[in-house]
Regions:
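Alpha-helical protein-protein interaction elements
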Residues: 7-9, 149, 185
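CoA-thioester-processing core
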Residues: 101, 141-143, 147-160
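Generic structural marker for isolated residues within well-ordered, non-membrane alpha-helices
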Residues: 31, 98, 154
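Conserved N-terminal beta1-alpha1 strand-loop-helix module at the mouth
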Residues: 1-91, 106-131, 162-165, 170-176, ...
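Extended, folded domain segments that form the structural surfaces/walls around functional sites
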Residues: 53, 135, 151-155, 175-180, ...
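Ligand-binding grooves and catalytic loops that recognize ribose/phosphate and carbohydrate rings
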Residues: 117, 124-128, 132-135, 148-157
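Glycine-rich phosphate-binding active-site loops on the catalytic face of alpha/beta enzymes
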Residues: 94-101, 134-145, 181-206
């Protein structure tokens, strides 16, 4: 019997959504500190709808703080400005919007998909080339599935499909549940920025919490063996 020790899968990383951008210089300074303190894989920049030139200037003001920290900069929607703004990709809501954005973004930039209400939608997004799928964000009416339903969807996707899955967490408890369910990334946003202790303390705590929750489920190395001959 030949056996090998398979290392535990890596813990999910943080995906940080910004507040709607009003003061990019102030936000850039804050982001620099946040990204130095916590392991953030990507930042989702949420822009207030304005003219393209204005939105591009906002993204360019934020880009150095994000990209020099080694994080990817994705824009929430607005695929047409991604290349000109120097962003790394875009997050699109719905399969149709994602497919429409593909020509402007592929093959050089990241295309994320959310707004996937059904398993069929999720599979369609994956087949259409999504670089990740997001589960759990609020719909247009502000409603979202239960924590248990989101965790179940993450677990289902993780077991069957290759593209990374992201869990949209609105609390520490959700972040922990999604890490334990097999999320590759945990998206956090408003509850980080509104934390009375400050965003940095909140983000560091969430990073530690998802690492611990992940370790509790996936943290032990496994021995795989097969009979020879």
């Amino acid at each position: 019997l030949a056996s090998k020790l398979v290392p535990p899968r890596p813990a999910p990383r943080l995906y940080l959504a910004t507040p709607p951008v009003d003061e990019p210089a102030q936000l850039a300074a804050e982001l620099a500190g946040l990204l130095a303190a916590a392991d953030v894989a990507a930042v989702l920049v949420r822009l207030r709808e304005t003219d393209p030139r204005g939105m591009i200037s906002y993204v360019k003001a934020l880009a150095p703080a994000i990209q020099t920290a080694g994080a990817a900069l994705l824009i929430d929607g607005q695929p047409d400005i991604v290349a000109r703004a120097g962003a790394d990709g875009a997050h699109l809501t719905g399969v149709a919007a994602m497919e429409d954005a593909m020509p402007a973004l592929k093959p050089d930039r990241i295309v994320g998909a959310g707004g996937l209400a059904t398993r069929h939608d999720s599979m369609a997004a994956g087949e259409a080339g999504a670089d990740y799928v997001l589960f759990g964000e609020p719909d247009a009416k502000g409603q979202r599935p239960s924590t248990e339903a989101i965790a179940e969807r993450l677990e289902w996707w993780d077991e069957l499909f290759e593209p990374p899955c992201v869990g949209f967490a609105t609390s520490r408890e959700e972040a922990e549940a999604f890490a334990a369910a097999g999320a590759d990334f945990v998206l956090v946003g408003d509850f980080i920025w509104s934390d009375p202790r400050g965003a940095k303390a909140a983000l560091v705590e969430i990073g530690e919490a998802i690492a611990q929750a992940h370790a509790g489920t996936f943290g032990k190395a496994k021995v795989e063996g097969k009979a020879e001959g």
